[in-house]
Amino acid sequence: MCDDDAGALVVDNGSGMCKAGFAGDDAPRAVFPSIVGRPRHQGVMVGMGQKDSYVGDEAQSKRGILTLKYPIEHGIITNWDDMEKIWHHTFYNELRVAPEEHPILLTEAPLNPKANREKMTQIMFETFNCPAMYVAIQAVLSLYASGRTTGIVLDSGDGVSHTVPIYEGYALPHAILRLDLAGRDLTDYLMKILTERGYSFTTTAEREIVRDIKEKLCYVALDFEQEMQTAAASTSLEKSYELPDGQVITIGNERFRCPEALFQPSFLGMESCGIHETVYNSIMKCDVDIRKDLYANTVLSGGTTMYPGIADRMQKEITALAPSTIKIKIIAPPERKYSVWIGGSILASLSTFQQMWISKQEYDESGPGIVHRKCF
């Protein structure tokens, strides 16, 4: 393991889940929620060795007694102390590696504040003493994972959605659009519309239950109005869900009303365009000669694109917006939940990429600002 490209680590820090593993693998070894939980109550059992904070799955399993916080909001790290805990947990508990022995590839959302990636760089080199690191744009990695160099990626996770047009491997920064509407907003919206049915979900722990309902039962309707009529006329769309305490709740039109907000953000009281229009607007900001290629290579990525029916609906909506002669193809790879990580794994194991790493030495000479020069 003396070679420099010895086992790079790939860490995709999402707003909702952290995906981590080794470059060259075909799937992340560790996938856990990006959550730090702190006890809500005073410990009374002396000698139990209670911790002052829990990370990831352990925080999730003890959520009843904890206040859960997500250190990444809308793709931007807002709480660095908690973020450090998550990285520490990733390296030492999940992957069981010493970060000072491996180059580390991190990911971030496009159009993030510059200070965000500088601070990431600083923590990697100064706190974890890693030998080399790199920060890659999430959507670009998703395109790599789909085996393309040209296309437009709609990457929608828990905290942020964005559309990134890429031509021959270059992201076109002027045409990147960002939409602060993603999985977490849909979870909150589902909490709200379930309240209308008389079910009350309020705490941070209950929000996780609603997220599970959303992931298991929601889908995107091809025709929203018609689906609403079907739901009103019969009970064919109703599904039941058993809560952890054994009580069973029934959900009907909420199943498709919740993800409909992706196409109609006005449901959430937002004035922005839906994801279909965002993709279209992003394509229209590109050079007229490459639009055809983008329409034909529209790649979905991220957990919020996992709803059944979303690809067909995108096809229908974008076809309605685009010129009638254009061929539109929506690519929704089955592994799209992890495609950012998979792309990172591919990138970090390319021989041509090895000269791209920012080394500890370069960092010591130039400081955190080096990240803007070396990473796209």
Curated annotation (Swiss-Prot):
<feature type="modified residue" description="N-acetylaspartate">
    <location>
        <position position="3"/>
    </location>
</feature>
<dbReference type="GO" id="GO:0005524">
    <property type="term" value="F:ATP binding"/>
</dbReference>
<keyword id="KW-0378">Hydrolase</keyword>
<comment type="function">
    <text>Multiple isoforms are involved in various cellular functions such as cytoskeleton structure, cell mobility, chromosome movement and muscle contraction.</text>
</comment>
<comment type="function">
    <text>Actins are highly conserved proteins that are involved in various types of cell motility and are ubiquitously expressed in all eukaryotic cells.</text>
</comment>
<protein>
    <recommendedName>
        <fullName>Actin, muscle-type A2</fullName>
        <ecNumber>3.6.4.-</ecNumber>
    </recommendedName>
</protein>
<dbReference type="InterPro" id="IPR004000">
    <property type="entry name" value="Actin"/>
</dbReference>
<feature type="modified residue" description="Methionine sulfoxide">
    <location>
        <position position="45"/>
    </location>
</feature>
<dbReference type="InterPro" id="IPR020902">
    <property type="entry name" value="Actin/actin-like_CS"/>
</dbReference>
<comment type="similarity">
    <text>Belongs to the actin family.</text>
</comment>
<keyword id="KW-0963">Cytoplasm</keyword>
<feature type="propeptide" description="Removed in mature form">
    <location>
        <begin position="1"/>
        <end position="2"/>
    </location>
</feature>
<keyword id="KW-0206">Cytoskeleton</keyword>
<dbReference type="GO" id="GO:0005737">
    <property type="term" value="C:cytoplasm"/>
</dbReference>
<keyword id="KW-0547">Nucleotide-binding</keyword>
<feature type="modified residue" description="Methionine sulfoxide">
    <location>
        <position position="48"/>
    </location>
</feature>
<dbReference type="InterPro" id="IPR043129">
    <property type="entry name" value="ATPase_NBD"/>
</dbReference>
<dbReference type="GO" id="GO:0005856">
    <property type="term" value="C:cytoskeleton"/>
</dbReference>
<dbReference type="InterPro" id="IPR004001">
    <property type="entry name" value="Actin_CS"/>
</dbReference>
<keyword id="KW-0558">Oxidation</keyword>
<keyword id="KW-0007">Acetylation</keyword>
<dbReference type="GO" id="GO:0016787">
    <property type="term" value="F:hydrolase activity"/>
</dbReference>
<keyword id="KW-0067">ATP-binding</keyword>
<dbReference type="Pfam" id="PF00022">
    <property type="entry name" value="Actin"/>
</dbReference>
